[in-house]
């Protein structure tokens, strides 16, 4: 099984393997097999469209966790210029599960903040698998207050299973750090745009998710608990995760229908990991458009609009 493809993608992986095999045979024997390769490529595209046009909520949840999916730093590299990372919460330490700093979007200074999971084992451990401790959220808060002070818009990228639930995090008051961020973000006198790029897990996501405009990538999720966690509570077994995912309404389209999400950003065929540069271009286009729209509001209008948006949830 190809580790770059999930189990429901394996028919696509098999076709891709055949295409690569034919290319190697053609190169070795100087054979003209272009027509056959083109036929298989068309078949692969059709198959991909068919599979991804009928994904279940559970399959989308697994796509949101795909090991090759672009992370915050990947998007920063492809969307922004002159990124200068800032470190530390000025209270305890620097949490690598949250990255942030000043950058430029369309030559305008912005503050970019996001979760970072890590690719290889050592980096995953260093970044705690994208699960921030209190110092991560306090770092994010410090950067957001700096952005307000210097009149910079704030752009956040959400991708976390949730806030870290370890003893050390609780000792440093994880819940207070999250709650304080919610309070601060609700009052910041600068535009805030949040984009869910992978997993939007519970309070760990909300802590950088209070905003004027909320986007979700097509194959991302946003929920109060993971499908496995929900299934374990309701059915006492994580094997019911597919049922839980469907019942919870965790996908971008479902949340858009509920009025929680403002914009669902399309992904390249097969997911953002198939073409990270194209995925970044789609996000950049949306961020530029939304930022131009939000700049039309003065501070009072911005805060009133944000308050009304938050109060509309559940109505």
From Swiss-Prot:
Domain of life: Bacteria
Domain CoA carboxyltransferase C-terminal: 40-293
A Pfam family annotated for this UniProt entry: ACCA
EC id: 2.1.3.15
Pathway as given in its UniProt record: Lipid metabolism; malonyl-CoA biosynthesis; malonyl-CoA from acetyl-CoA: step 1/1
Assigned keywords, A-Z: ATP-binding, Cytoplasm, Fatty acid biosynthesis, Fatty acid metabolism, Lipid biosynthesis, Lipid metabolism, Nucleotide-binding, Transferase
Annotated coiled-coil segments of the chain: none
Reaction(s) the record says it catalyses: N(6)-carboxybiotinyl-L-lysyl-[protein] + acetyl-CoA = N(6)-biotinyl-L-lysyl-[protein] + malonyl-CoA
Signal peptide range in chain numbering: none
Subcellular location: Cytoplasm
Major subcellular site: cytoplasm
GO BP: any one term: fatty acid biosynthetic process
Disulfide bridge map: none
One Gene Ontology MF term: acetyl-CoA carboxylase activity
Cellular component aspect of the GO annotation: acetyl-CoA carboxylase complex
Function: Component of the acetyl coenzyme A carboxylase (ACC) complex. First, biotin carboxylase catalyzes the carboxylation of biotin on its carrier protein (BCCP) and then the CO(2) group is transferred by the carboxyltransferase to acetyl-CoA to form malonyl-CoA.
NCBIfam families assigned: accA (TIGR00513), AccA_sub (NF041504), PRK05724.1 (NF004344)
Family in the record: Belongs to the AccA family.
Subunit: Acetyl-CoA carboxylase is a heterohexamer composed of biotin carboxyl carrier protein (AccB), biotin carboxylase (AccC) and two subunits each of ACCase subunit alpha (AccA) and ACCase subunit beta (AccD).
Protein name: Acetyl-coenzyme A carboxylase carboxyl transferase subunit alpha
Name of the coding gene: accA
